[in-house]
Amino acid sequence: ISFLITGDEEGYATNGTKKVVDYLKKKKEKINFCIVGEPTNPNKLGEMIKIGRRGSITGKLTVIGTQGHVAYPKRANNPSDVMVKILKKIKEIKLDRGTKNFQASNLEITKINIDNYADNVIPGFAHATFNIRFNNKHSSNSLKRKLNTIFKSISKKARCKFNINYQVSGEAFLTKPNKTTYMVQDTIKKITKIKPKLSTTGGTSDARFIRKIAPCLEFGLVGKSM
């Protein structure tokens, strides 16, 4: 039995579980099963086991226009207008309706920023950030292709340029329940008197690294206050 404690689980999470997994892969260590101690229970201990997670991709988009004076709009090209069209378009996309094991994929716009301190100046740049939580009907690469097609189409029509940077926190994954999963489920029920639901809801976790070397599930404390 091995026990791993990490202090680098949030954000980029580069110096914790990820490096341990890389080390174990190089050493060709075999792990039979892993339990990740995430706060999986919504309200009471014993309610939920996580057997998979949605993927997460963040996009930082910049639309590049031409700065100018608002009194002479024909001499400028307002990137704000283009950004609004792009954000409206990607927000309206219905990525899917969910699956048997996953809720529907969802895009949220998290930041909109225009660095313009003058009220009478058309800005040269417009910035926005968005995040998609996606199920296993998609990969980060398939979503990038879909989004980039939209960015190119709208920007080209507006005669603007754009830059996009993506950060992928993890791909969607599902651990098919096996006898170990059901053994843990039965044990939890015996102790808590609650049969835990097998779920894939919530954010990303270090299970996204562990699942590359071993089947895993997540079970831990109550996460009601998160």
Task: Describe the predicted segments one by one.
Residues L4, I35, A158, P215-F219:
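Hydrophobic/aromatic beta-strand patches that form the interior of the parallel beta-sheet core
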Residues G46-I51, D115-V121:
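Short beta-strand/turn micro-motifs at beta-sheet edges
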